[in-house]
Amino acid sequence: MAALEAYMTPEALPGTESGRIGKLLGLKAKSPLDDIGLADHIARGLAVSAAETLSLALGRAAVVGPLIPEATLRRAKKGRKALSREMSERLYEVSRVVDAVSRLYHGDEAAISRFLNRPHKLLAGRTPMEMAQSNSAGAEAVINMLRRAESSFAV
């Protein structure tokens, strides 16, 4: 989770969600990444390196298997092809959750890991990571819960 240490000093992070997500995914951009640029990257399909970069932050077991089948990742890497739009969107959704949690916990890797991997009552006993990995609605449920926490509502 060393990649999350940047969240300890928020002034060092990109100022936009798109920029932070781009950083989590290791996206290279000539200018600061905005919403349109990020959407274009995802629509074209992210490079295999995006999955590898996110794996450095979360651990391989959180990305390879639950988000992208290992065989798919291996084929894309061997053929030097981009990931499919579906796989790219999965990486994006989990990155949104990781960004939100990392901002809330200011890069505290232990707290981030506990939050992501502990079952939560507001998620019907599922972990935030399971919800984020499931689909975009699951990721949105976690983000909404985090917004409540930021607004000082009990979660």
Features from the language model and the residues they span:
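Non-transmembrane "mature" sequence context
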Residues: 1-155
